[in-house]
């Protein structure tokens, strides 16, 4: 996306007159207890698989560690460190500038198919979404929740319009409405933001449970299980 296109995108403000944010302290308490208990159980169960995956990543590319740590923007704009299994080469961030012209997403988001920076084991981890599992530690620490808008990069948030920043009203999550959309990379940035605003207005325990089950179904279907 060119600078001119990005500036044009930023100046087009969607109609959010129907958006309404309501604090839900009881739901937030239930959500935090659920996140804390389930993430702890997952950490215990996945401890050995985490070690095995880490070793495989190191064998595939020894130039960097198995865990990728990056700044992300959380609730109310607070910055936190997100954890993921490393799926790209050690100098992936340095190569980003030369790949920007191939960006397949609109808005302040970068995604391309067949990214040349992805390692062999990284392709497998991404195809199964296993690379996202270390975010369970973020959930346990309270940086994230199982359900909520996906956490954005600080440089992306800097380009947000006021309507886009509404997604920062709640704790970011591991999955969301956008995450379970078929061919989600074909979803426009504005549609993505609208899905996040929809979740913020409608959020409740039943929606969270449905999204968690939909995510598991989506992953199993995607992997052919």
List the model feature ranges, each with a label.
Residues 22-92, 210-225:
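A hydrophobic, helix-centered structural microdomain
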